[in-house]
Amino acid sequence: EAWYVPVPAAREEADKILAHFSPALQNPKSLKIGQNIKFDILVVRKYGIRIAGPLFDTMIAHYLLNPELRHGMDYLAETYLKYKTVRIEELIGPRERKQLTMRDVPVVQVAEYAAEDADITLKLKNYFTPCLEKEGLESLFYDIEMPLIYVLAEMEYTGVTLDTVALKQSSEELTTALKKLEKEIYELAGMKFNINSARQVGEVLFDHLKIEEKARKTKTGSYSTSEEILEKMRSKHPVVGKLLEYRGLKKLLSTYIDALPELINPETGKIHTSYNQAVTST
């Protein structure tokens, strides 16, 4: 038997409902069972509730037992319980299209989905518990992986503060440095070209400058200008070193310096990371 309690979007009303569950959720002695329970810990934390007590995460349990397999609930239910769950896409639509939110779905359907979710999670917990014991994984699971969930959840919730002023200054400095490098590369190459185009870089290095007679080509017929290839040819022409320096600064600028400020949460003013304990092992 499972129960579903709708929680309204309005914060004050939601707080009133969650207040009834707070003592149980914050009880340090009661076991909390979940599938990817870190997600649930973070959801209620936003409402001022800090879940406490021992945990049993069915996703992590399965990861320890079979790290090379998938760990989603739908897969686990079909594989170990021989049960086909209601897929969330059946309620809110496929990812390829504009999805609904669960608040857009009739409460009767949401209740059935949520109740099934809880029921399946409990059944999976009962299935995996003896498996962990049989494989000698109890200490790793209960003493390391489960406490780690609280640590990771706290790290994600706390977030990271960025010095946006310093990043902006670094962005300006790197942009200036890239423009200078661009001019130097054109002078060394004896022509202008798109430095960010691997195809054009290959044509300049191997057709125009002819720094390598037997240059390697990709399946598409273009010259390979990977970092590994260019490093081997660094001593053959000064433009190669400049190209490598340009690429390094360009990646630093686009991937970190300019990108990180865009990831700041407007509500907290911080970047909030996400840590995965169940990365598929290959």
Residue ranges: model-predicted function:
Residues K38-D40, D57:
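Short, solvent-exposed loop/turn segments at secondary-structure junctions
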Residues I51-M59:
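Short hydrophobic/aromatic-enriched beta-strand-loop microsegments
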